[in-house]
Design a protein with these regions (language model features):
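Catalytic alpha-helical scaffold of carbohydrate-active enzymes acting on polysaccharides/glycoconjugates
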Residues: 1-220
Length: 220
């Protein structure tokens, strides 16, 4: 968990404990909400999990849907949500769910929960993942750092060196490296992560095969 995410989590926890969330809800919830989700899968306990912000558990999804209904939200399609924003119609606030990228667990873990609640969703598929032509570079980076105790990158345009002996050091390296790579070109990012993945013997193609649906799976 990044420092920024920790601050947000602490702030939200404090608001919840004071009861301000209930008092402010009628004034702050607006006409509706769009929940943008990625992975939905059982939690695998691990100390180093920098991409945890991109996943929730099926149990969390179930509780979230129950909570939305109890708060008076109507779960609608994205098309209906857009129509309500344009026309202002609707007697109660709406909630709509979207899932990004096309992860396999959306089908295996999220769909049973969604079907049980009768909730429509919108799936935004990354064609490169479905066609196996793109890489999950942020997950590659996490898995590489999990295996490596030291990171040393000597490139003409990018240099980086740090120890990664424990969860705290690995988290710090991930945050720093992630930030610096995102500031540069996409090709440099992919090249650096590819080099680290090769050093850590990460099967980058197998990672996409294991975590992402292909077009046949998406059609289901």
């Amino acid at each position: 968990m990044s420092a920024r995410h920790s601050v947000f989590a602490a702030a939200l926890d404090a608001i919840g404990k004071t009861g301000l969330d209930s008092l402010l809800a009628p004034l702050t919830r607006g006409v509706g909400v769009v929940l943008t989700l990625h992975q939905v899968r059982p939690w695998s306990a691990r100390g180093f999990a920098p991409n945890r912000i991109l996943e929730i558990t099926p149990e969390f999804l179930d509780v979230a849907l129950i909570s939305l209904k109890s708060l008076g939200y109507e779960l609608v399609t994205l098309t209906e949500a857009v129509a309500r924003l344009r026309t202002g119609r609707g007697r109660c606030p709406f909630a709509t769910l979207t899932f990004d990228d096309g992860y396999r667990d959306n089908l295996e873990c999220a769909l049973p929960v969604l079907e049980r609640h009768g909730v429509p969703i919108t799936l935004f598929v990354t064609p490169g993942f479905a066609e196996r032509s793109a890489r999950l570079w942020w997950i590659e980076l996490e898995e590489a750092l999990r295996r490596l105790d030291r990171v040393s990158i000597e490139d003409a345009d990018f240099r980086f060196a740090a120890m990664a002996r424990n969860d705290a050091e690995k988290a710090a390296v991930f945050d720093d490296l992630y930030r610096r790579l995102r500031e540069g070109s996409e090709q440099q990012l992919l090249d650096v992560v590819a080099a680290l993945s090769a050093e850590a013997r990460i099967d980058t193609q197998g990672l996409v095969d294991r975590l992402c649906l292909d077009w046949d799976g998406i059609a289901q």
